Amino acid sequence: MKYSFLYLLSELAVCIILLGCSTPSKSQGMQKGFVQIFDGKTLKGWEGDSTYWRVENGSLVGEITPATLLKRNQFIIWRGGLTKDFELTLEFKITKEGNSGINYRSEELKDLQYALKGYQADIDGANRYTGQNYEERARTTLAYRGQKTVIKEQSAPGPLQDHIKSNAWTETTVTGSLGSSDSLKTLIKSEDWNKVHLIVKGNRMLHYINDVLMSDVTDNDKINGKSSGLLGVQVHVGPPKKVQIRNIRLRQY
């Protein structure tokens, strides 16, 4: 019994060390060091097309009307600099027809105004995609809601389309489950305020909605993956829609 007890203690200690060193903790986001990057009154520090973006009742609002339908996705971009390792918290509300997302470690396209290419924490009004990791204008879906995935290392650059099938990156290994997509969907409120918490450190990206982990990606693809880039919020092409974002706070490491 003494040997078993000591053995269990040693195993527990190893687990605690591993968790502390290698797994970003959601609770870290509640610590000090967060900076508010949207003042709730103006678009100071942000840049986008005023046809689609405005401030209303303390929220950053992206809206498409019947008179302003889009031909391509549009972003409002945070001009506070590039982000590398960080945590981001915010709240969102989106109409049922809505399609949006929070882009990070993204690249601004030179030939298209207010267009970003990069990782995205997906948001949509039907909650079909909310919480997943989607790479805009690049490798497409890296993890569906409920998945823990590892993106395989690539040996050489090549056409991305060679590794995309059904709008998902095929060079991906699912290494674990965070719960079924349908069960996690029940935790996301429709047309009401939901909380987003992103933890991005090294090649690990965790997407939380309402304090529940929705997707977990480890990106070992050094050719196509990005270690830093821009932050932005998307309005997606499609029917009229509205997304509201508030209480945007960033903590950089």
Go through each PLM region and give its residues.
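Bacterial N-terminal signal peptides that target proteins for export
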Residues: M1-L12
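Carbohydrate-interacting regions of secretory-pathway proteins
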Residues: T23-Y253
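C-terminal motif of bacterial Sec signal peptides marking the signal peptidase cleavage site
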Residues: L19-G20
